[in-house]
Regions:
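Conserved pre-motif I regulatory segment
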Residues: 42-75
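Interdomain linker/hinge connecting the two RecA-like lobes of the SF2 helicase core
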Residues: 70-73, 77, 185, 191-192, ...
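Conserved P-loop NTPase motor "coupling/switch" region that bridges the ATPase
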Residues: 101, 127-130, 148, 179, ...
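Conserved Walker A/P-loop ATP-binding site and its immediately adjacent core
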Residues: 101-121
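Conserved helix/coil segment N-terminal to the catalytic DExD/H
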Residues: 138-149, 158-176
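SF2 helicase motor core recognition
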Residues: 161-164, 219-221, 385-386, 422-446, ...
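Conserved helicase ATPase core of P-loop NTP-dependent helicases/translocases
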Residues: 386, 396-426
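A conserved SF2-helicase RecA2
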Residues: 449-458, 462-506
């Protein structure tokens, strides 16, 4: 069947059992998970929020959209429940005999924690069996061999090159080639990345391909090409990036580091992408409590700023009696971010030189003022996490090296209100995780360079199910790259442009 061919209209779940149509559209009450309630009122709140979870009308429309199309994107605000919509469509396709299985590619922790939990939150999805493809290669191969025994197999995006190698030898009618679901397609936006290029080689073997995203074009419309190539198998814009890029963009500099769209190109690309995408508007989303971002600006001591300016202008500086140099302006940008946070890496990540303690003192005061209210702490560098733990004790963390086995209990404890503090790295735990039941405050020791990571990270607590006023605290060192990072997030400057402007100002 073609991507636009309709198989049949989707029967709303509950209707086939005699339930009225409006019940199926407005939502289905989900049973509460078995959680030790304890005496903490936050646990009671989290349990109540889960037990009254419903399927919204826009999710039902999205499920219909997927059911009727073999190549489709769902663009919806962060926290909109895109996974539930995709699984609803899959469940109906399986029930009607059109499909047997879905292969889900998602950020590592999301694949291991969110997708297995999702099917337990909805009665009409409870029959779906989910396996997580992780661990040693032997274990992963054993699970792949048994894919026909379940409806969903989830795998982290970091394992895509390995996965493609394993799938290459399978028969065309293998269940693993029924439905491909890419959760947060921005992880595959790099046209030169190994993951996206590997997946593109076998994209056409999947009968259905669906993409889910809350940030469709995190930096520019060029970010749309590779996901569109995979989901449509090149039918939308082709499979070769460079010719498409040169038709719609021109280089801003002689080296092609930055590109700008030709007049009218952005609108043309957006309209074309809209032919294969369903978009959920913000007004379709359930009402969320207020969101407040509080910036705290710290003035670094004069000696620290003098050392900072030396690194910016000369690419070397002195700290704690040591001379530390940067090999290039781009590397110096990272060094300046470290200095703004309070340290400098010397020979490596295990060799940190003290610069100042203003930011960690700010964090300590914030934690004390919250008087036990749960706080998520976003950190950028490993040394940031070490500093946090030296100041506040052995704070648990979701980072790049966190395994699924380690992450699951931390997420459960947080959502039960049992963790007063939880640190996380936005690149490792900023996508897809549901952390809204455990708290409503977040602290950033420094802004992120990435608008997408910032938006995704905040959406871990600012999403449907959150009932409290959400406050995001951001610490900014005045006159440093912290300000450039914030401006880049707001204005979409490149790292090179931000550094150039910063040099002009100091």
């Amino acid at each position: 069947m073609s991507a636009q061919q309709v198989r049949r209209s989707l029967t709303p779940y509950g209707q086939e059992n005699g339930a009225p149509k409006d019940q199926a559209i407005q939502g289905i009450e989900s049973p509460a998970p078995q959680v030790d309630r304890g005496d903490d009122s936050r646990k009671e709140t989290a349990l109540k929020q889960v037990s009254t979870r419903t399927l919204y009308s826009y999710q039902q429309r999205a499920a219909t959209f997927f059911y009727e199309r073999d190549a489709a994107f769902l663009v919806a605000p962060l926290g909109a429940g895109k996974g539930a919509a995709a699984l609803t469509a899959l469940a109906d396709l399986v029930r009607d005999g059109h499909r047997r299985h879905a292969l889900v590619i998602a950020p590592k922790l999301v694949a291991a924690t969110v997708w297995p939990l999702e099917v337990t939150l909805w009665p009409h999805l409870a029959h779906l069996r989910v396996a997580v493809l992780n661990g040693a290669p032997e274990r992963r191969r054993a699970l792949l061999a048994r894919a026909g025994e379940r409806e969903v197999t989830a795998i982290g995006v970091d394992l895509v090159p390995w996965l493609v190698g394993e799938l290459a030898g399978l028969e065309p009618d293998h269940p693993l080639f029924d439905v491909l679901i890419i959760d947060e397609k921005s992880r595959l936006k790099d046209p030169y990345g190994k993951r996206a290029r590997a997946l593109l080689r076998i994209a056409g073997r999947f009968r259905s391909r669906w993409g889910l995203t809350g940030t469709p074009r995190p930096n520019s419309s060029m970010d749309l090409f590779m996901p569109a190539a995979v989901i449509t198998d090149g039918a939308l814009w082709g499979r070769a990036f460079v010719p498409w890029q040169r038709r719609h963009f021109r280089p801003r500099d002689p080296f092609g580091r930055e590109w700008v769209a030709f007049p009218g190109a952005e609108a043309k690309i957006t309209a074309s992408f809209g032919t294969v995408a369903m978009t959920v508007a913000d007004e379709d989303m359930p009402d969320l409590p207020p969101l407040n971002v509080v910036e705290t600006h710290l003035q670094l001591p004069d000696p620290v700023m003098a050392s900072y300016r030396a690194m910016a202008r000369k690419l070397f500086t002195t700290a704690e009696g040591r001379t530390i140099a940067a090999a290039s302006p781009l590397i110096a940008t990272g060094k300046l971010a470290q200095m703004a946070n309070g340290f400098l890496y010397g020979a490596g990540n295990d060799d940190a030189v003290f610069v100042h303690d203003l930011k960690i003192e700010w964090l300590k005061e914030l934690v004390e003022s919250l008087d036990g209210e749960p706080l998520l702490i976003a950190y950028e560098f490993i040394e940031d996490l070490r500093t946090i733990r030296r100041a506040l004790g052995q704070v648990p963390a979701l980072g790049g090296s966190t395994t699924a086995r380690e992450a699951l209990p931390l997420i459960e404890e947080w959502n039960e209100g049992a963790l007063p503090l939880l640190a996380f790295h936005p690149a490792a735990a900023g996508h897809g995780l549901n952390l809204q039941h455990g708290g409503s405050r977040m602290a950033w020791l420094s802004p992120s360079w990435s608008a997408e990571l910032t938006q995704q990270a905040i959406a871990r607590i600012y999403r449907p199910g959150q009932t409290r006023h959400v406050t995001v605290h951001v610490c900014i060192a005045t006159g440093t790259v912290d300000e450039m990072k914030r401006d880049r997030v707001l204005g979409k400057m490149s790292a090179q442009e931000a550094f150039r402007r910063h040099l002009e100002q100091i």
